[in-house]
Amino acid sequence: MKVVRCSLMPRRWCINLFGVAVSGDTSWIDRRVVNHERIHTAQMRELLFVPFYVLYGIEWLVRLVLCFSFMRAYRSMSFEREAYGNDADMGYLERRRAYAWLGYVFKSQ
């Protein structure tokens, strides 16, 4: 996965844009972060990229209304729960089933 530094991004943030990880500071990005972003790339591919971003935004807004917190909304999203829950498992993507993130939509935390 390609990792790109962008001075417009906060230092400890990383965003996956169409399979490219973008961060304000790339020195903190390790194998686990790269694996996390690769999981997002798999999610994007199965949704054909643009619908992923639309669903991601809609789910974040719904979770924000339910959680009243930007960070809690982010961490409770199905896409993020799959990625955070499996980013330490470097073999996860080989075993991952298609649309695995759907299993996290209504699953309690």
Model-derived segments and their meaning:
Residues W13-V34, M44:
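Short pre-active-site segment immediately N-terminal to the catalytic Zn-binding motif
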Residues M1-S7, V33-H40:
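Short secondary-structure boundary segments
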Residues K2-R12, L48-Q109:
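Metalloprotease/metallohydrolase-associated module, dominated by Zn2+-dependent proteases
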Residues A42-Q43, D87:
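Activation segment
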